[in-house]
A protein has these predicted regions:
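Residue-level signature of catalytic and energy-coupling elements of molecular machines
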Residues: 14, 33, 64, 92, ...
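Conserved C-terminal "switch" segment of AAA+ ATPases
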Residues: 2-5, 10, 67-77, 81-143, ...
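Flexible glycine-/small-residue-rich
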Residues: 13-17, 63-66, 77, 83-86, ...
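C-terminal engagement/docking regions of AAA+ P-loop ATPases
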Residues: 132, 136, 140-210
Length: 210
């Protein structure tokens, strides 16, 4: 609020589900959050460190969480829950092109002309080396590729090849970590195909013996 210079600002509470990890000798942070998010009390929220009341009644709070399982029920009762689906593979590729690749190139001192990652290569990385709703693992894999190319450029600048192929990806990262799941074209007697939804936003195929 001090940085925003406004009492009607928007405040982001990132990873609210991590509050439970602070329980113990350091106090209960969820008790303070209950008071902060309660419209009947937050007009005079008192910070025990500063020992002064703060009016939070005009603040719009937006909280994020990876899982609702570790958030106390009283805290969930004070918020409206909106479930956001994980990124699709196409969205991951778009995010990688616009943000992740430029970020890794800048971090390793390389330019766009020195490391060329096509959409097909990025899609292969997303499908074969990551299995998550977000893009953190994909960013790490892209970082591994860029670092390997930086070493190649430093060691052999005259024979360096800037275009990265799927073969280069598998040489640097190893074989695919995840194989694409497909339904058997020919049914097997006594085996049914099911679908599972994971908390990360991903799905999978299950072969169930009846």
């Amino acid at each position: 609020m001090r940085k925003a210079r406004a009492s009607d600002c928007v405040m982001l509470l990132d990873e609210l589900d991590k509050l439970s990890s602070g329980l113990g000798v350091h106090g209960d942070p969820t008790a303070a959050m209950l008071e902060v998010l309660d419209p009947e009390q937050n007009h005079a929220f008192k910070d025990h460190y500063l020992n002064v009341p703060v009016d939070l009644s005009r603040v719009i709070f937006i909280a994020t969480a990876n899982s609702l399982d570790t958030i106390p029920e009283p805290l969930l009762d004070r918020v409206d829950t909106v479930h956001v689906a994980g990124y699709t593979f196409d969205e991951k590729v778009a995010i990688a092109e616009r943000h992740l690749v430029p970020k890794q190139l800048d971090a390793h001192g390389l330019s766009n002309s020195q490391v060329k990652l096509s959409q097909d290569v990025l899609m292969h990385v997303a499908q074969s080396y990551t299995r998550e709703a977000g893009v953190r693992t994909m960013e790490r894999r892209i970082g591994d590729i860029v670092r390997a190319k930086a070493v190649e450029y430093a060691q052999s600048p005259n024979t360096y090849e800037s275009t990265i192929t799927i073969g280069d990806v598998e040489r640097i990262l190893g074989g695919p970590t995840y194989e694409p799941e497909v339904v058997d074209e020919v049914g097997v007697p006594g085996v049914a195909t099911g679908m599972a939804y994971q908390g990360s936003g991903m799905g999978s195929i299950l072969h169930i013996e009846c």
